[in-house]
Amino acid sequence: MSDFIPSQAISRTRAGQEHYVSDIDETGLGAVDAVADESAPASMWGEAWKNLRKRPLFWIAAVIIVIAVLISAFPQLFTSVKPDYCELSHFLGKPEAGHPFGYTFQGCDIYARVIYGARASVSVGVLTTICVVLIGATLGSIAGFLGGWIDAVISRVTDIFFAVPLLLAAIVFMQMFKQYRNIWMVILVLSLFGWTQIARITRGSVMSVKNEEFVTAAKATGASRWRILLSHIIPNSMAPIIVYATVALGSFIVAEASLSFMGIGLPTTDVSWGADISQARLNLREAPMVLFYPAMALALTVLSFITMGDAVREALDPKAKK
């Protein structure tokens, strides 16, 4: 009898030759899958989230943005005073209980006006950003994917609109249609001239992604051009669009405040940080704090969106991780 060999099994052929066959690995399939999952590379967004979680500025900006959005959506939760309730007896009154920022020259509560002023500014920024992303991303995707004369036409139209400064065009149009001054007119004007950069970024990103191997594989499976564009190219081109949109949102808030500051933005019946800053500048020496609070709210909100955009860009940019 041959000796027992635990690690091998002996088999004989008809010629009498011995062959040694190793034992079957009895490692469970679940354990193999677990190891494979742990060793699998994380997705781009997963790596970006891991990077963002380590950035204190990202969390500070995120908290400020969440607070600004909540204030603009539910201002009545943060103050019980109406922004248009004014009493001349409170002329430049000092801060007191329930009125932590004091009063304006007309006796209005500064804190209430800062709270309600967030609604107009943040709403214009968010809605304008949504509009320019829809317009710019659509045109940029079509131009970058189809190419040819369609790309040439869209690119030339984009260059024409890009050559016109956003704020200057907004001033001209708001003056031309001043009888229709409202929040929707401001959003329309800013969207009409603010989509060009998004279109150029999307076009470049789509042209880069459409040459990737997974797009070639999708074509080999017989997928239609529009299915490839919507299911494969656009989802993988979103990173630079999201980064720019976050930064642009802050820019649109500044644009609205600038128009209201000049008296050609929102109507005087609407509360706006820009309009309050414009009124407070007339008596800056006598009461600087009347200007300080709306200006600080505007600066913090805009800076938070810009910081958020920079943090996301660095998290998604492989060169920034080195």
Regions found by a protein language model. Give the residues of each.
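Gly/Trp-centered helix-boundary motif
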Residues: 1-137, 141-142, 149, 163, ...
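Short alpha-helical transmembrane interface motifs in multi-pass membrane proteins
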Residues: 30-31, 120-124, 139, 154-157, ...
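Short helix-capping/hinge motifs at transmembrane helix termini and TM-loop junctions
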Residues: 75-83, 144-148, 173-179, 193, ...
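Generic hydrophobic transmembrane alpha-helix motif, especially the helices
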Residues: 100, 110, 134-136, 144-145, ...
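Amphipathic cytosolic juxtamembrane alpha-helices at the membrane-cytosol interface
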Residues: 108-123, 127, 147-155, 207-211, ...
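Residue-level hotspots within pore-lining transmembrane alpha-helices
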Residues: 119, 161, 165, 177, ...
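Glycine-rich helix-loop "coupling/hinge" segments at transmembrane-helix boundaries
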Residues: 162, 173-177, 190, 206, ...
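Transmembrane helix boundary and interhelical loop/hinge segments in multi-pass membrane proteins
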Residues: 205-214, 311-319
